[in-house]
């Protein structure tokens, strides 16, 4: 039987009694954000709104974005990425499970030196895809042009964030490239790999 989102006790400052809030609301108060699904407009708007609100509330405390995502839509993902660069606090990115496609793009978009992968996490990069088979001829041409622009944008961001030459990133994105946490670190997508059973980083 589904139990829904777990609830945890939370005590507001100055109040004696605790109230029960869902676990994500409680974690948001600690500036911990979660992308645990495919990227779409709804989750993009939620994360953008949270980052902006938390930045207004306190622009000196870092934000932490935990990622376990198979990827998703390009434009909503770019909206999250741009917001991460725009808000004053540094945004740490943490890969747990899988960061694929747009998930890996957002992982790389964290503050450089503050991007982390758990030891058994997987990362995958590839070029943006499209639903060409649904388009008419004229739409196909326009969509192809737009897709090329998006691919160039994403490739340049990867090159900037990883320190790899543009041609290396371009070749890597020709196909699905899966990486372990240490391979993602060598590739420049993350800066640190968490060490098991300790609070330290490698």
Swiss-Prot record:
<comment type="subunit">
    <text>Component of the chloroplastic Clp protease core complex.</text>
</comment>
<keyword id="KW-0378">Hydrolase</keyword>
<keyword id="KW-0645">Protease</keyword>
<dbReference type="GO" id="GO:0004252">
    <property type="term" value="F:serine-type endopeptidase activity"/>
</dbReference>
<dbReference type="GO" id="GO:0051117">
    <property type="term" value="F:ATPase binding"/>
</dbReference>
<dbReference type="InterPro" id="IPR029045">
    <property type="entry name" value="ClpP/crotonase-like_dom_sf"/>
</dbReference>
<keyword id="KW-0150">Chloroplast</keyword>
<dbReference type="InterPro" id="IPR033135">
    <property type="entry name" value="ClpP_His_AS"/>
</dbReference>
<dbReference type="GO" id="GO:0004176">
    <property type="term" value="F:ATP-dependent peptidase activity"/>
</dbReference>
<comment type="function">
    <text>Cleaves peptides in various proteins in a process that requires ATP hydrolysis. Has a chymotrypsin-like activity. Plays a major role in the degradation of misfolded proteins.</text>
</comment>
<dbReference type="InterPro" id="IPR001907">
    <property type="entry name" value="ClpP"/>
</dbReference>
<comment type="similarity">
    <text>Belongs to the peptidase S14 family.</text>
</comment>
<dbReference type="InterPro" id="IPR018215">
    <property type="entry name" value="ClpP_Ser_AS"/>
</dbReference>
<dbReference type="Pfam" id="PF00574">
    <property type="entry name" value="CLP_protease"/>
</dbReference>
<feature type="active site">
    <location>
        <position position="126"/>
    </location>
</feature>
<keyword id="KW-0934">Plastid</keyword>
<dbReference type="GO" id="GO:0009570">
    <property type="term" value="C:chloroplast stroma"/>
</dbReference>
<feature type="active site" description="Nucleophile">
    <location>
        <position position="101"/>
    </location>
</feature>
<protein>
    <recommendedName>
        <fullName>ATP-dependent Clp protease proteolytic subunit</fullName>
        <ecNumber>3.4.21.92</ecNumber>
    </recommendedName>
</protein>
<dbReference type="GO" id="GO:0006515">
    <property type="term" value="P:protein quality control for misfolded or incompletely synthesized proteins"/>
</dbReference>
<dbReference type="InterPro" id="IPR023562">
    <property type="entry name" value="ClpP/TepA"/>
</dbReference>
<keyword id="KW-0720">Serine protease</keyword>
<dbReference type="GO" id="GO:0009368">
    <property type="term" value="C:endopeptidase Clp complex"/>
</dbReference>
């Amino acid at each position: 039987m589904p139990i829904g989102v777990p609830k945890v006790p939370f005590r507001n400052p100055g109040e004696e009694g605790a109230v029960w809030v869902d676990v994500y609301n409680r974690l948001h108060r600690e500036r911990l954000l979660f992308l645990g699904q495919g990227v779409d407009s709804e989750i993009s708007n939620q994360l953008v709104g949270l980052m902006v609100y938390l930045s207004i509330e306190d622009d000196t405390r870092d934000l932490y974005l935990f990622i376990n995502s198979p990827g998703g839509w390009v434009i909503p993902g770019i909206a999250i990425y741009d917001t991460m660069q725009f808000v004053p606090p540094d945004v740490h990115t943490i890969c747990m499970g899988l960061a694929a496609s747009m998930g890996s793009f957002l992982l790389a978009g964290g503050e450089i030196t503050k991007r982390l992968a758990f030891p058994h996490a997987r990362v995958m990069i590839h070029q943006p895809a499209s639903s060409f088979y649904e388009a008419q001829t004229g739409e196909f041409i326009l969509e192809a042009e737009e897709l090329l622009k998006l691919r160039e944008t994403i490739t340049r961001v990867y090159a900037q964030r990883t320190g790899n030459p543009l041609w290396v990133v371009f070749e890597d994105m020709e196909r699905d490239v899966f990486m372990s946490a240490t391979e993602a670190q060598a590739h420049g997508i993350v800066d640190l790999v968490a060490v098991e059973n300790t609070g330290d980083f490698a």
